[in-house]
């Protein structure tokens, strides 16, 4: 229900303090903005934004919202690429930005942090003591957001596992306002029932994660390697060979398609061969161990047909090479294509090269708006996530942009079904609900709907996400 905005703001100020409730249009737009290429519309705006300081204030906000049947949309840092933080029914946007505590307990060998702290800050503080965060998402993303999606970013799943493998426990505020503790404070995770596993990956529909406890992982030694191929398909074959022939997996790795590499090289001042590029980061107990593993990656790449492959010995050059992907978007921008939308496809390993080939030529031979876009391909080596970013003129009308967005999402769904993929990086809700239903069936989807109703009988928390509203 809609409530009087002035009364809502006053009531919330009484719960969290006057300085932490925002009703100005700018703030409401800021907290509703997404990666969509067109402007936020009036129907997407919350009535107000609130920043509680702790789980008790969050509890009070949720109890108030239940009493008045006001929807609450959670907001960590706004880096969601599938629009879970965009309000679907106005109401309250609840930001966890003030939950930034961090305790590193070396005696117990875990760290505990507030859900709103940025991954970049945790990486920095852990690094000072020789530890590593097994979540390598954008440095501006929040820990709570990563855990709620169960994403680890660019890291290889088979090395460190996902957050569900490294989280010892959570503090969670339920949609009805109760605060619960889950998990363990010892290094042994609970066998059998452990409610932490229910909330990890639940994408914010069952409760608000307010605190995360994770195991400490020693910082590994690393060595980087790079290889240049004629096509991305050859990289796909190399990845398949890496697994089948039991090469030591890299802890991190990226590839960039032919089109994007050229601009990336120019931006970074690199004189590298034309074609596609793969870069990997191998780890080891010590530098010698890491170097041996990196040399194995060089051997793999050469065996798979790389034009050139070598160890990146110069740290400055290595930094530039990793930056090639970050600059790849300039390939579209130099053509005046500033609107963009990315998709994610996770093919099975035997069909990885096939999917890469299809995405390389995805705009060709079409009679839709996708045919008018420029597409570039990039992704992860180790975890087979392929991303294709579609760039198009920013002066397209909003209606035209919405049409191409729908076409791109439908394309992603078709490709995921074709290659038996999942939401490996970004999760499911809300815009991948049709994919989930088609992949797993209505019965599986209805189980999630019933869980949501059990935890949130008034459908207060992130209303519209499980329904697939975008």
Language model features with spans:
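FAD-binding subdomain of flavoenzyme oxidoreductases
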Residues: 100-105, 111-115, 119-252
